[in-house]
Amino acid sequence: MNSFEIVASSTESTVVAEYTPEKRKSTDYQSEAALEQDFINRLVSQGYEYITIKSEQDLIDNLRTQLEKLNNYTFFDKEWNDFYNSVISNGNDGIVEKTRKIQEDYLQNLTLDNGYVKNIKLIDKTNIHNNHLQVINQYEEDGGTHDTRYDVTILVNGLPLVHIELKKRGNAIREAFNQINRYQRDSFWAGSGLYQYV
């Protein structure tokens, strides 16, 4: 029976590791910045779009653009503001409710200015190739308990759904999990809480 080292665990999940060391050891030093750039380059080579996001407003504007493309619909400003505030960044929603929106309730209602209702997909689960994948890095959040800078985030249709903390060779992977747990506690909820979708 294999035994696994527990890297991180919570009431929702457990991450384990099984490591078989390679006989060949690299003597090359790779900084965390170089590791990050290499990782981004690999994602771009697989079809991800690299974009620069410097503020929460940039993140929100990109989200609107991506949802408009996915749904082949252009929001009027009032429609977008209502949809964004009531569905995407609803202040009453926490991480559980936001996860449910992605996993189960990914089709949301938009009440149009003319009173009609239109379905808006957050994610296309029928044809996953309709979803647009983007990668950003070094996004800074200063509205949390502490100022933070996130290494790499993958956006799916503009929503931050995957967050990656990279560690250079020699640093324990556990440090990355601890850092993400700190972010979840101290900053993912900041601003309009978009990082709670991670």
What residue spans do the PLM features occupy?
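An alpha-helical interface "stripe"
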Residues: M1-V198
